[in-house]
Amino acid sequence: GMGPDPNPRSSAESSSAESESSDPLSRDDYTRVIELLLPVLKASGYLVHELTGMGGFGNPDGTHTTHMGIVRLGPDTQHRRIDIKVYPSATISAAILHFTGSAQFNRFLSRAARELGYYLSSDGLFKLPPNHPTRAPRPPNLAPVRCPEERDIFDQLGLLYVEPTRRKDKSDVLLPDGTPFWSTKAGAAAGAAANTALR
C-alpha cells in the first residue's frame, strides 16, 4: 500500500467500552496513526526534522493528538513547519471547520455557539448544561453532539451554512434568513462583552 491505513478504527473497535463517545479511538490509536505515518514521510525525504517525540502530544482530555515537524518539498525549497493532527472521525467536521476560514470568523462562530448554549472548538460541538456561565471552560466529560459534516454544526446552532471561502469575519456568521448573527440584539450584546474582554 501507499502507507498507513487512514482509518485505524477497526483495530480499536472492541476496546472502546470505556468511552461513551461515538468514536472508539483512544489516544494510543491516534499515536499509532502518527507512528505509521512518520516513517513514510521521513523515507520520502519530506519530513526532515521532528519537533515533538514519536507519539506527539494530545490535549488533556485526549480528543486529538498533534505531531510537529519540519518539512521540505524539494532540495531547492525552504523548510516549513507542519502540524499533523489526528482527530476522531466523530469530531472531524469540527476540526475541518476550525482550520478553514479566517481566525476571526472562527472566533465569532465559537462565541455565537456560546451564546446559543454550546461550546465549539476543533474538538467538537458540545451542548452546555443549562445556566453554564458564558466564559467558563467546557465541563469535562461532555460528549460531542453528533455532527458528521460541517453543515451539521451550523444546523445544530440554527445558523446558515457558510462556504469556507466566505468565512471572513463576524459579519459572515449568519442566521437562517441571512441576517448577521452579531447584528441582532443578543449577538451585539455578546460581541460588545467579548470585545471588552479582549482589551
Language-model features and meaning:
Residues 3-11, 15-198:
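Acidic, metal-coordinating catalytic segment for phosphate/diphosphate chemistry
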